[in-house]
């Protein structure tokens, strides 16, 4: 069997696909700006205009650096980000998708990534240069040889530098919080392979429209809103995460305005969108939406149900809601539900979801029931459920291992960490070597994949495994003063025994006093005791905005545990 990680020969690279459209005057990328216009102002580049701008960026990069060097993308989320990314690829350099310092909540991550990869050149927009100079003054980051505002460059002729599929295209910094930043090395071949896999899974072609608001420095945003449109030759329409958070209905209005829409978001976004339904969406037609990818964080049955209930009257089809699974180390996409099938939920016995345990399906009203949403089947890559290096049969929980042409080449200049993650050896398997250990736990049931949680996040008490997300759901349902999806459960050791701690934000609507704080704590502890037969070692109620989240919106439990142990949470 050939090594799937190097099976690139039949793939057209994404940068080649873009260059091939240099003579096309049709619309390519549209950025909708809500900053100064409540209804949004669209700014569009045709394929030919985009190609000319990209060549101008590449020409300038070639003047100040060399192929193979790192180029940091520090543009605001607009068309400059797109031209900067492809400019680096045309120049044969390694793009590093990051963000302008205006995303202040991720400043530590930005500084860490810059220090890790030491890019020679920073690309940005003219309006953002002041923020980068301030960053250099305030933080110990390596100074670039050149800071370039891509929106000020004159057009120049430039011939794209030939690259091989095995060469790095960009470094995708993961949003983990337990160790130093890690840049997954995404090769040109891996990107092309993942674009092909996404196209196969969701039927993306030239008539599709990729639309959304995901941050372009995040793997799901970069692939779905930038690389996929270029590889498929379809239109991209995007706005900013801030525009969505301010008014979630903007997302639904956007996807209703274009044909054949493919859009993607984490689970929490569907919660937001469902709550925005009502008069604000009167007259909206979502019948042309082909695919809404739900991924990047645990997918909740109640979210899926609420979203379908809110958007069904607007013409949205349940089968268009596509729960999926992916991660940066696999470029982004791994698996999805089958075209034409509505989301599927199975209720498992939560006491039998530990690694190596055989699962049991129970009725939904059983006290032990936990509903899990299927994320379907892997597309174009091998997926195995593994315990101690051996594949386990369907129905047994294990770590998800992956092998395919879309898998990253490792972490940038971190050999030990790369070997730990990317050199999994499968006993009695084929291929035997080169498996990606994802760190995610899952189970196959009736041939479909269900994600049960993160291996490193498991809370083990008296030999029993507990998933933190299950405890978090129980706590947030215990009292209306607890803010939804803004809490973290993790384990700490006390007096020689390990037990759970929950840190939860209260809602912005409540005025907290000692009496209410005590009431919330008592109800949270009682709910966890009833539901999970666990005693919380501590329950901490904190103000809104306290709970740390990753760039993709996931709860950063390890970071919260660290902050708790450091006494930072009161």
Residue ranges: model-predicted function:
Residues 192-209, 219-261, 276-279:
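Conserved AMP-binding/adenylation subdomain of ANL enzymes
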Residues 27, 148, 155-173, 179-180, ...:
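Conserved pre-ATP/AMP-binding loop-to-beta segment of ANL
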Residues 16-46, 168-171, 178, 326, ...:
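AMP-dependent adenylate-forming
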Residues 29-86, 103-111, 183-192:
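Conserved AMP-binding/adenylate-forming core of the ANL superfamily
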Residues 260-264, 276-367, 382-384, 389:
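Gly/Ser/Thr-rich phosphate-binding loop
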Residues 373-381, 386, 390-395, 399-461:
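Conserved ATP-binding/catalytic segment of the ANL
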Residues 485-490, 501-502, 525-570:
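Conserved C-terminal "lid"/linker of ANL adenylate-forming enzymes
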Residues 122, 256, 263, 404, ...:
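AMP-binding/adenylate-forming catalytic core of the ANL superfamily
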